[in-house]
Amino acid sequence: MPRTQRNDNFIDKSFTVMADLILKVLPTNKKSKEAFAYYRDGMSAQADGEYAEALENYQEALTLEEDPIDRSFILYNIALVHTSNGDHQTALDHYLQALDLNPKMPQALNNIAVIHHFLGQRSEEAGNDDEAERHYDQAAEYWTQAIRLAPNNYIEAQNWLKTTGRSKVDVYF
């Protein structure tokens, strides 16, 4: 059964109805509409915690979608699923692919930084200080890039950069 027929709550149903209406009126080709339908079903499955189903839908959408910006958001959502599953390397790979297609995606830069920060903490707890510093430096690089793109966001990251001495004074302007 298609995911659009299984949504039980009002917001999901409303989103599905609106998405279906948009699909019908958009002046795009059939392949793009089909890609969007898979993407929409992937987001719905992801919201329900059905990560395997979400990945299947995102992979189908990625196969069909030709627009690089749309592909970047599909890759970003694939990365989110892998992040949720704790598969950090696969998540990093997909975030980087998304950035290759759409370099102005601060949320992907932020998520890469968050993963490196997490890996730095884990390395530090394991007593591997050199590896921890490498991850923290990577986190600082990616947060710096994210903040350059969205200077009013990522306040906690800005504070972390300042308190750890990794902040560059002119970086946010």
From Swiss-Prot:
TPR repeats lie at residues 35-68, 72-105, 120-153. NCBIfam families: PRK02603.1 (NF002725). It is found in: Cellular thylakoid membrane. It comes from Synechococcus elongatus (strain ATCC 33912 / PCC 7942 / FACHB-805) (Anacystis nidulans R2). Pfam families: TPR_12. Belongs to the Ycf3 family. PROSITE patterns: TPR, TPR_REGION. Essential for the assembly of the photosystem I (PSI) complex. May act as a chaperone-like factor to guide the assembly of the PSI subunits. GO terms for biological process: photosynthesis. Keywords: Membrane, Photosynthesis, Repeat, Thylakoid, TPR repeat. InterPro entries: PSI_Ycf3_assembly, TPR-like_helical_dom_sf, TPR_rpt, Ycf3/AcsC/BcsC/TPR_MFPF. GO terms for cellular component: plasma membrane-derived thylakoid membrane. The keyword Transmembrane helix does not apply. It comes from the Bacteria. PANTHER family: CELLULOSE SYNTHASE OPERON PROTEIN C, TPR REPEAT-CONTAINING PROTEIN MJ0263. It is a peripheral membrane protein. Gene3D superfamilies: Tetratricopeptide repeat domain. This is Photosystem I assembly protein Ycf3.
